[in-house]
Amino acid sequence: SQKTDVISGQSGRLDTTKVWRAEYIEDNRIFHTYEDDNQPSFTVDLLLDASASRLQYQEMLAAQGVIIAKSLVECNIPVRVTRFCSVRGYTVFHILKSFRDKKCDNIFNYYAAGWNRDGLAFRGIGKILDMNPGVADRHLVIILTDAAPNDSQRILPSQDSPFGHDYSDDISVNDAAEEVRALRAKGIHVSAVFMGNDAAANSAEKIYGKEFTRIRRIDELAKAAGRLIQKEIQSLTR
């Protein structure tokens, strides 16, 4: 998205309020001219679930990520691509492409391993945005997900739950939904590309509300993400 700014210049449309400047202070910038400001209106964070459930799709998924990133770079929309997974109690983020990177080849380094603790992933991307928000005020986070958060590391005991809980099923879905709400409360737009079974579709709705689109095959990822980005662009013009 581009904004057009009116600036003073030595050619263009005469600004009658500035004619005096040419004679008295030898300033010839007495015309209105227009400059395209290529400042983007929003940034995109593409968050790729890299848990072991994606193992059979990892090459195709990486290729789709490259397609999305290249398209956004060509449109001058800053995009960051991050893979996440949970291993031995830690959620690991690997930034495959930063906002500054023009090349997208590192996205091919995507690989799948471990678990997916989605709630912690959303909290983490919020921290990453706090540290490096990019050049725009608005932010769109798009996650590729199966809407089935799962981790071998249990939720620790607490006053409400003295024995703790497995991080799975309703517990993990509610945790992810809570973190999505927290991001949205900060003004961050969160959408999902969902690829999973019918049972998980209900979980996707609990976590993302109506802000998700479903795909049946991994090679549909780029088109689905494109629709979500187009929706964001349309919301900017309202």
How would you describe each model-predicted region?
Residues 1-238:
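Acidic, glycine-rich A-domain
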